[in-house]
């Protein structure tokens, strides 16, 4: 009963996700460009990851902490916004959804990004930090907090430097042109599309 509900809900969320034309999501900018492309071209492989227990656990922890932030810090949760950039003479939308946004006493936004991880080694991870920095740019915010929940600890890291627009344009170019695939050497090890990818690192 509960298992069926969780799996069905996860699949419905995945299938309802339709990418708009000339739109790049923040998460696309911090992962392998080929993986982003393959998720659209090989949907059957992408769907298989929907049922991973670790993904469902992450969703549940997100919902729980977002509820705590909403109830105790007056946070807005699942806040979406977008900004436009010019890449090669063409306008693209950079779209993102922050886990939560808290207003401080001065009315300024603090962007909260929640991450779950099996390990607490090497935190904060560079791609997570970059993601939050892009959110700071996207929401015109000066402060962000990266919250990690792992089996061994709960930790938060303050990020106060938005990514500059020139870097975001370069990341978007990589995503569009399939350059710098993968972005990080470790990505292939965990990628469902590695079985068909010519850029796989051995």
UniProtKB/Swiss-Prot annotation:
Q: Which GO terms describe its molecular function?
A: 4 iron, 4 sulfur cluster binding; DNA binding; manganese ion binding; single-stranded DNA 5'-3' DNA exonuclease activity
* Impact upon substituting residue 32 to A: Abolishes iron-sulfur (4Fe-4S) binding and exonuclease activity
Is Signal among the key words of this record? no
Q: Where does [4Fe-4S] cluster bind?
A: 32, 188, 191, 197
Q: Which GO terms describe its biological process?
A: defense response to virus; DNA catabolic process
Q: How is the cofactor bound?
A: Mg(2+) or Mn(2+) required for ssDNA cleavage activity. Can also utilise Cu(2+).
Query: Which EC class is the enzyme in?
Result: hydrolase
Q: What temperature-related properties of activity are listed for this protein?
A: Optimum temperature is 65-70 degrees Celsius.
Keyword terms, alphabetized: 4Fe-4S, Antiviral defense, DNA-binding, Exonuclease, Hydrolase, Iron, Iron-sulfur, Manganese, Metal-binding, Nuclease
What does the record say mutating residue 113 to A does? Impairs exonuclease activity
What outcome follows a substitution of residue 191 to A?
Answer: Abolishes iron-sulfur (4Fe-4S) binding and exonuclease activity
The UniProt annotation places Mn(2+) binding at 62, 99, 113-114
- Which reactions is this enzyme annotated as catalysing? exonucleolytic cleavage in the 5'- to 3'-direction to yield nucleoside 3'-phosphates
Read off the InterPro entries from this record.
Cas4_exonuclease, CRISPR-assoc_prot_Cas4, PDDEXK-like_dom_sf, PDDEXK_AddAB-type
Q: What is its EC number?
A: 3.1.12.1
Its cofactor is:
Mg(2+); Mn(2+); Cu(2+); [4Fe-4S] cluster
Record note on pH: Optimum pH is 9-10.
The similarity comment for this entry is:
Belongs to the CRISPR-associated exonuclease Cas4 family.
| Subunit text | Homodecamer, formed by the assembly of dimers into a decameric toroid, with the active sites oriented towards the central tunnel.
Described by its record, this protein's role is as follows: CRISPR (clustered regularly interspaced short palindromic repeat) is an adaptive immune system that provides protection against mobile genetic elements (viruses, transposable elements and conjugative plasmids). CRISPR clusters contain sequences complementary to antecedent mobile elements and target invading nucleic acids. CRISPR clusters are transcribed and processed into CRISPR RNA (crRNA). This protein is a 5' to 3' partially processive exonuclease that cleaves off single mononucleotides. Has a marked preference for ssDNA, although in vitro it also acts on dsDNA and ssRNA.
Q: Return the protein name.
A: CRISPR-associated exonuclease Cas4
Organism, by scientific name, is Saccharolobus solfataricus (strain ATCC 35092 / DSM 1617 / JCM 11322 / P2)
What lineage is on file?
Archaea, Thermoproteota, Thermoprotei, Sulfolobales, Sulfolobaceae
């Amino acid at each position: 009963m509960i298992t069926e509900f969780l799996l069905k809900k996860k699949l419905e969320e995945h299938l309802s996700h339709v990418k708009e034309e000339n739109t790049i999501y923040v998460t696309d900018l911090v992962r392998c460009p080929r993986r982003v492309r393959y998720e659209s071209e090989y949907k059957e492989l992408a769907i298989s990851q929907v049922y991973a227990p670790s993904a469902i656990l992450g969703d549940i922890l997100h919902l729980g902490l977002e509820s705590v932030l909403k109830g105790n810090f007056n946070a807005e949760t699942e806040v979406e916004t977008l900004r436009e950039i010019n890449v090669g003479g063409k306008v693209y939308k950079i779209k993102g959804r922050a886990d939560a946004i808290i207003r401080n006493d001065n009315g300024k936004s603090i962007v909260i990004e929640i991450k779950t991880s099996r390990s607490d080694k090497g935190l904060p991870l560079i791609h997570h930090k970059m993601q939050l920095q892009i959110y700071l740019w996207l929401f015109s915010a000066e402060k962000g907090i990266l919250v990690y929940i792992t089996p061994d600890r709960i930790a938060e890291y303050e990020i106060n430097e938005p990514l500059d627009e020139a870097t975001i344009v370069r990341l978007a170019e990589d995503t569009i042109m399939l350059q710098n695939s993968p972005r990080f050497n470790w990505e292939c090890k965990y990628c469902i599309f590695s079985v068909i990818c010519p850029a796989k690192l051995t």
